[in-house]
C-alpha cells in the first residue's frame, strides 16, 4: 500500500514537471481560420465551429470555439505553447439536411502548416472558403458530445 502511494505521488510530480517544462521550453504558436458555411444555398447560421491543436499522445487542445453569424461567416484564432509545431484543425458540427437524427454531423479541416505563426497572434488566417454543408465530407461522422 505504501509503495503504491509513493508511486502515485512520483507520477503526479513527474506530470507536473513535464507540464512546467513545456511552458518553459515550448514556443507560443498561433493559427487562425475563417470561412462561410451554407446549407442548400442559404447561409448556415449558428453552426458550432471549433479550432483545435491536434495532439497524438493526449487530448486535443481547444484554441477557440464559436458560432457562425447570420450570414454563415466565422473566424477563429488561438494560441498554444508546444515544444513541436502545432497541428491546427477546424471541427464543424452541423445538422444540415439532418435535423431529425440525433447528434450532429462532424467533420474536420486541417490547416496547412504554413499558416502556423510563432507568437500569440497569427500573421495570416487560413481561408477555408465557402463550404456547402449539404454535401458529404471525407471523414464525416456524428458527435453527440461536442
Regions found by a protein language model. Give the residues of each.
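Beta-strand-dominated extracellular/periplasmic modules and repeats
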Residues: 16-130, 138, 142, 146
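Classical eukaryotic N-terminal signal peptides for Sec-dependent ER targeting/secretion
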Residues: 1-16
Amino acid at each position: 500500500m505504501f509503495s503504491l502511494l509513493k508511486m502515485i505521488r512520483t507520477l503526479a510530480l513527474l506530470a507536473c514537471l513535464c507540464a512546467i517544462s513545456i511552458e518553459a521550453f515550448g514556443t507560443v504558436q498561433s493559427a487562425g481560420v475563417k470561412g462561410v458555411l451554407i446549407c442548400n444555398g442559404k447561409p448556415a447560421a449558428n453552426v458550432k465551429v471549433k479550432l483545435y491543436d491536434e495532439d497524438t499522445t493526449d487530448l486535443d487542445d481547444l484554441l477557440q470555439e464559436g458560432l457562425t453569424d447570420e450570414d454563415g461567416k466565422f473566424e477563429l484564432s488561438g494560441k498554444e505553447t508546444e515544444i513541436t509545431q502545432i497541428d491546427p484543425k477546424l471541427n464543424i458540427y452541423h445538422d444540415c439536411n439532418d435535423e431529425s437524427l440525433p447528434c450532429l454531423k462532424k467533420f474536420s479541416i486541417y490547416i496547412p502548416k504554413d499558416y502556423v505563426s510563432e507568437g500569440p497572434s497569427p500573421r495570416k488566417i487560413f481561408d477555408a472558403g465557402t463550404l456547402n454543408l449539404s454535401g458529404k465530407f471525407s471523414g464525416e461522422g456524428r458527435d453527440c458530445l461536442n
